[in-house]
Amino acid sequence: EAVGALKKLKDEGKIRAIGVSNFSMEQLKEANKDGYVDVIQSEYNLLKRQAEDELLPYAKEHSISFVPYFPLASGLLTGKYTKNSPITDGRSRNPLFQGAAFEDNLAKVEKLREIATAKEAEVAHLVLAWYLKQETIDAVIPGAKQPEQVLQNIKALNIHLTDEECAQISGIFKR
């Protein structure tokens, strides 16, 4: 019903696209039963890759654009954290930033740092470049709190990854 109303607005030229966010597969299939969904935004990053199981294949099959949120895993995939970094904000409740999982994630990020260093790049730029190379990702919107971060993120466009490098990065975060 809601998607039908959005379709009417799209047909009238009042909106350009119909998008959904945080939908389960069941919800997405229901919303897209008439093929009207244009874009879905869902959590996806190198540390949380569940979208690869069903969501990304479904989106590709139905020509639905996919936009990941938390592409840098709340900063964890930027390389700025160490095991001694104080995590005092909302991240302290995120399992990615807790205990053994945090240390394991940091070890993976250090492997990324090796690849980034070889490419004379920062870890965050390498990760963003990896997204841009994925055929199932249509746009990446990394969060930025400072204007300088936006300018820094643009540097990802200058990193060219080979298929082998993308596979190497994916392999570091194998589920």
Spans of features found by a protein language model:
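Beta/alpha (TIM)-barrel catalytic core signal, keyed to glycine-rich beta->alpha loops juxtaposed to Asp/Glu
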Residues: E1-R175
